[in-house]
Amino acid sequence: MSYPENVVVLKSNHQLKGLFTIIRNRETKREDFIFYSDRIIRLLIEEGLYCLPFHETTITTPTGCEYQGVTFASKICGVSIVRAGESMEAGLRAVCKHIKIGKILIQRDEETALPKLLYAKLPHDIANRQVLLLDPMLATGGTVTQAVEVLLERGVKEENIVFINLVASPEGIKVFTDKYPRVKVVTGEIDSHLNEKKYIIPGLGDFGNLYFGTED
């Protein structure tokens, strides 16, 4: 199946498939789930950084020679969608030293069943930054759509957002990319479908509960 140009799926290989096999296995222990999820998250973060704009720069090496390199074109920050998105913060900090990370909390309104913003704490200059938006699962697309609305209201340009997640549904991909065609999406795998309960199939369950060892 083909997806829009703004959707990047990690190139499948035996190593990556093996990592997903472990975290999707219902028999996997929590410490192993965390360890192997972190490995996938690190790969996703690196791919997300590759999507950001760079500009050329010249530096001098210890040998006194010039080297033509590149650097980020603008400052970056992370924004995690609480709670599950917080599981991806360590992976981001592991490759981006001293990066600022904001948080957005969105929950479903029990009366309307629609996502509702409860809390947002973001860098004051976020409008001038490239934003890596973190949430491990993309099911219906409702939560991340609301999160992007918050970022746009704070002045972030749509094309300056990279949404990073581990597992997505085709339905969620379509909903999200139809609404935000200029937001880049980086995902580990796109699954088969959503079931009648809007769970990703085959999926892996509630990522936040599995990672943090809690239950709803």
From Swiss-Prot:
Annotated binding of uracil, by residue: 200, 205-207
Protein keywords: Allosteric enzyme, Glycosyltransferase, GTP-binding, Nucleotide-binding, Transferase
UniProt: GTP binding residues: 30, 39, 73-76, 100, 129
Residues annotated as binding D-ribose 5-phosphate: 199
Matches recorded under Gene3D superfamilies: 3.40.50.2020
Cofactor note: Binds 1 Mg(2+) ion per subunit. The magnesium is bound as Mg-PRPP.
Keyword Protein transport part of the UniProt annotation: no
The reaction(s) this protein catalyses: UMP + diphosphate = 5-phospho-alpha-D-ribose 1-diphosphate + uracil
Biological processes per GO annotation: pyrimidine-containing compound salvage; UMP salvage
CDD domains on file: PRTases_typeI
EC number(s) recorded for this UniProt protein: 2.4.2.9
Pathway: Pyrimidine metabolism; UMP biosynthesis via salvage pathway; UMP from uracil: step 1/1
GO molecular function: GTP binding; uracil phosphoribosyltransferase activity
Binding site for 5-phospho-alpha-D-ribose 1-diphosphate: 83, 108, 135-143, 206
Activity regulation (UniProt): Allosterically activated by GTP.
Principal EC category: transferase
InterPro entries from the UniProt entry: PRibTrfase_dom, PRTase-like
Co-factor(s): Mg(2+)
Family: Belongs to the UPRTase family.
Job of this protein: Catalyzes the conversion of uracil and 5-phospho-alpha-D-ribose 1-diphosphate (PRPP) to UMP and diphosphate.
UniProt-recorded name of the protein: Uracil phosphoribosyltransferase
Gene of this entry: uprt
